[in-house]
C-alpha cells in the first residue's frame, strides 16, 4: 500500500490489503559482512495492471543498470542508466510527459525516484566508503561490492491515472565486480 512509497518505512503496523504491494527491504550478515536485498510482492499473489507496469519499468531499469556494471564504470554511470530507463518508462506510462532528454535534464523523474541507484556494501549494510576521490567518481574495480536498487514511488496526486496512486516498487540486488563484468 501507500507505505511502500516511504523509503525505509519502519512502523510495520498497517494491515496488508489484497490489492496492495508489500515492499520488503532485508539484510543479512555473514562473517561480519553485510548484504542487502529488496523485493516487492503483490499481496493477492498477482499484480494489477498498474502495479505490473511500474514493476516492469523498475525491473527493466535494474536489468540494464546491472548490465552496465563492469570495471572502469562508476556508480554515477550505473545510476544514469537506471534513470534513463525509469524516465523512459514513466513517459510511456503517461506519468511524465515530454521528451526523455528534457525530463532527465530537468530531473522530473526525482518526484518518483528520489534516491541513488545503489550504495557500497561491506562491514555495514550502507558501507560509509566515499563515492569520489579528489572530486572524481571512484571507478569500479574487481572485488568491489555494491547494490543496484532502482525504484518508483507514486503517492496520491492529481494529473495521473488513479490506478498508479500509492504504488511503491523497488528491486535490489547485490553486485560483485569481476574482471570482465559482474555477478
Can you describe what each PLM-predicted range is?
Residues 1-183:
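Active-site neighborhoods and metal-handling regions in enzymes and metal-associated proteins
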